[in-house]
């Protein structure tokens, strides 16, 4: 299954706020409608929608998300928490959380077009797994800096999570540590996502 490129508002109207996909927010009316429907949903539907929220927020294909679930399942600790850490430490998400891109698709575009450096080296793989002490910078070219400056100026001013530090005038971000799950940028019940996949096998 390919990455979603359809109408974004349609998705947030059904699944709720997906800040990684779009900065738009669902209307109060659609949120109330979703709440009234939630009591009528089957357990399968509830798990499916949590999985879809995760997939669309981080901009993943079905195959990519399944791969992350399998990696998380083999790691020590809670599978759901490890899954969220893996997704949050992707380079495209780090760029988004730093405010150097307004959405994850925008971050992915910057990375694909080679505007982003990690520890002084160009990285053009959005799924690159960042680690503590990594330094994320704009390429030392005017076009790269202008693009990122525009995003820094236009991105909504969210409180920066504790695991990140931003130096906007240097076009630089620092990863201080692995993310604490309370700072995950999406309201999600990750256990339902793990349950969804465990019941598919």
From Swiss-Prot:
Stretches for region Disordered:
15-44
**What's in the keyword line of the UniProt record?**
Chloroplast, Plastid, Ribonucleoprotein, Ribosomal protein, RNA-binding, rRNA-binding
In the UniProt record, does the keyword RNA-binding occur?
A: yes
Give compartment(s): Plastid, Chloroplast
Q: Which GO terms describe its cellular component?
A: chloroplast; small ribosomal subunit
Q: Which Gene3D superfamilies is this protein grouped with?
A: Ribosomal Protein S4 Delta 41, Chain A, domain 1 (1.10.1050.10), RNA-binding S4 domain (3.10.290.10)
| Annotated GO MF terms | rRNA binding; structural constituent of ribosome
The record's similarity note reads: Belongs to the universal ribosomal protein uS4 family.
Give the quaternary structure: Part of the 30S ribosomal subunit. Contacts protein S5. The interaction surface between S4 and S5 is involved in control of translational fidelity.
Protein name as annotated: Small ribosomal subunit protein uS4c
Supply the source organism for this entry.
Answer: Glycine max
Name of the gene this protein is made from? rps4
């Amino acid at each position: 299954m390919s990455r979603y490129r359809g109408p974004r508002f349609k998705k947030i109207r059904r699944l709720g706020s997906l800040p990684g996909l779009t900065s738009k927010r669902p209307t109060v009316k659609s949120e109330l409608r979703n709440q009234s429907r939630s009591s009528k949903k089957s357990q399968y539907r509830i798990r499916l929608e949590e999985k879809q929220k995760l997939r669309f927020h981080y901009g993943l294909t079905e195959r990519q998300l399944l791969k992350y679930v399998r990696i998380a399942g083999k790691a020590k600790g809670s599978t759901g928490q490890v899954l969220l850490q893996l997704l949050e430490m992707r380079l495209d998400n780090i760029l988004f959380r730093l405010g150097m891109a307004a959405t994850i698709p925008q971050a992915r575009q910057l990375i694909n077009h080679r505007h982003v450096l990690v520890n002084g080296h160009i990285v053009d793989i959005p799924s690159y797994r960042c680690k503590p002490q990594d330094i994320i910078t704009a390429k030392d070219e005017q076009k790269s800096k202008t693009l990122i400056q525009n995003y820094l100026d236009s991105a909504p001013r969210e409180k920066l999570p504790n695991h990140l530090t931003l130096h906007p005038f240097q076009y630089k971000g620092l990863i201080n540590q692995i993310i604490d799950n309370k700072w995950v940028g999406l309201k999600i019940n990750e256990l339902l996502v793990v349950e969804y996949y465990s019941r598919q096998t």
